[in-house]
Amino acid sequence: AQEPVFVLSEYPADAPDRIEQRRNVTPSDKSRYTGDLTLVTSNMTVSAGEIFTMALRALPQTTHVGAPTRGALSDVLDKQLPNGWVVELSNEVYSDHEGQEWEGRGIPPSQRFAVFTGDNPLMTHAALIRQIVEGQR
């Protein structure tokens, strides 16, 4: 991006007043990448990877391919119980630059195809990445 870009917003799910925090990506004044970017995701893309996915999808040079993310991107709220146990509750609601919330659904790519398949999923993943780099996908 040449200028700051709004990429996502977040707010605490249990807040009585919905006060969103808007997040922007601001380009560096030193060096920046402005070329095409292909983002590959799968159901193994989860949590911070999904927040990163939302941020990259807001940039005009990003093409999102692969399979939908897992759909588990909320921050947690820790609560200690009287017996000393700790319970972690999903607490943060994220929405992308278009206002979409992907929690529980996963972020779908614009071009869908399996990323990990067959008897050797790591090899099929490597072959897929090779095809993308070589322009065959």
Task: Identify the role of each PLM range.
Residues 34-37, 49-53, 119-130:
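Extracytoplasmic/secreted envelope proteins and their assembly/folding machinery
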Residues 53, 62-67, 97-100:
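Active-site-proximal C-terminal subdomain of hydrolase catalytic domains
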Residues 1, 57-61, 130-137:
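Sec-exported extracytoplasmic/periplasmic mature domains
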Residues 16, 95-137:
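Intrinsically disordered, Ser/Thr/Pro/Gly-rich linkers and terminal tails that flank
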Residues 1-36, 40, 44, 74-78, ...:
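Gly/Ser/Thr-rich loop/hinge elements
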Residues 53-59, 80:
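Short, solvent-exposed amphipathic alpha-helical segments in soluble enzyme
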